[in-house]
UniProtKB/Swiss-Prot annotation:
Segments for region (Disordered): 1-32
Protein name: Small ribosomal subunit protein uS5
Function text: With S4 and S12 plays an important role in translational accuracy.
GO CC, one annotated term: cytosolic small ribosomal subunit
Any GO molecular function: rRNA binding
Gene3D superfamilies, alphabetized: 3.30.160.20, 3.30.230.10
Lineage: superkingdom: Archaea
Keywords attached to this entry: Ribonucleoprotein, Ribosomal protein, RNA-binding, rRNA-binding
Subunit composition and interactions: Part of the 30S ribosomal subunit. Contacts protein S4.
């Protein structure tokens, strides 16, 4: 018994068109600060911070730090009972860094995973700030920016993290997610200690970010 042969392509036999990846729409600034950045009047985040201006557009960060990378750190499901039954939402955590002294972390929640990630991505970009790199290890004392300049401590929820200077070539002595955040910030060598509920990604990420921002507030 012969079987009908399937024809390649779609239902009408025509070849399927390959979907091209969507190109990101060009940034059109909406704020006065964004317009100045887009016009080239402001060329660094330091200028914005010194002026005490508030960044409200992620496009500003992308324009000033074109080498910035964003990575999804964690995606989870939030379920709770409501009067209409069980409600399900997604929670995403995204990190943004250029592996050379800048890091930001954001969180987003939505009914769709994609939208939750987009919200977290945008928030991570808006939270990007400078990290002071250096060599604070008494075992090394070189002049390269491969570690932190001194011991720093940060807290997020129940999680407390310390980052200590390490000699060049040691690497990052840290757990997987903490290590990746340090890499995105630009650290190559460091000791770390962590206390509390470190599997809680949101608290751990906040603790790491606060830790690294101490490099400026203490310096």
């Amino acid at each position: 018994m012969s079987h009908p042969q399937s024809r390649p392509g779609g239902r009408d036999g025509r070849p399927r068109r390959r979907r091209e990846p969507r190109e990101e729409a060009p940034w059109v600034p909406k704020t006065a600060l964004g317009k100045r950045v887009n016009a080239g009047e402001i060329t660094s985040l330091e200028e914005i911070q010194e002026a005490g201006a508030r960044i409200q557009e992620s496009g500003i960060i992308k324009k000033l730090l074109p080498d910035l990378k964003t990575e999804v750190v964690d995606v989870g499901i939030i379920q709770k009972m409501t009067s209409n039954g069980q409600s399900t939402r997604f929670k995403a955590i995204v990190a943004a860094g250029n592996e050379n002294g800048y890091l930001g972390i954001g969180q987003g929640k939505a009914k769709q995973m994609r939208i939750a990630i987009e919200k977290a991505n945008n928030q991570a970009l808006l939270n990007v700030g400078p990290i002071k790199l250096g060599c604070g290890s008494w075992e090394c004392r070189c002049d390269q920016k491969h570690s932190v300049p001194f011991k720093v401590r940060g807290k997020g929820g129940s999680v407390v993290i310390e980052i200590l200077p390490a000699p060049r070539g040691l690497g990052l002595v840290a757990g997987g997610k903490i290590r990746r955040l340090l890499e995105l910030a630009g650290l190559k060598d460091a000791y770390t200690t962590a206390k509390g509920s470190t599997p809680t990604t949101n608290s751990t990420s906040k603790a790491v970010l606060e830790c690294l921002r101490q490099t400026f507030s203490q310096g």
